[in-house]
Amino acid sequence: NLAGAIAPKLDYRVQIEFASPKIVDAYIRYRPFEQLNFQLGEYKLPFSIENTDYVPLKYEFIEYPLSLRRLMGFNDVCGLSATGRDMGAMLYGGFFNRKGYSVLGYNFGVFNGEGLNVKDKNKSKDLVARLTLRPVRGLQIAGSYYWGEYGSDYLKRVRYGAGACYDEGPLVVRAEWICGTTGLPAGGELDSDGW
């Protein structure tokens, strides 16, 4: 893991997994204001509480939930195996700041849709949006949306998610629901959902 600041509002991170080997994260961030920031590179998609806010070292279980793995690119039903990451550009920020957190947060990104270390296979870009509400310290309520087309056949990939989490001190309570529709190469669509 190599991270640092180029300037007071400009930083970067490069994380490599040497076992594979592959680049896991490689991005640059420009953070001019609390309300408007820009990130460019390869990194975790801003979809779901568990994919965005919980890294394996912080996670309580040995594996991510099946719904997240099957619908967000860990072992996706569309064939992606990307640990919830992709290449793209994202705007993000927060409003109504309190001590250490923003009450309202947003993420909006445009991504390749092919996953980790993979060149784009079509001309379509995938869109990901997330809104987060934190009414009090430790409590987070979030909603996510993902729209994209994958592969050279431009097969549909749509995901929705909603969840809540309380993480303060020794207490962590988290619930999340994710659903999606995936176009299949043989024709038809697969609808999936899970908690």
Feature map (PLM): residue ranges:
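Outer membrane beta-barrel
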Residues: 1-116, 121-128, 132-141, 194
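Detector for outer-membrane/organellar transmembrane beta-barrel domains
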Residues: 132-195
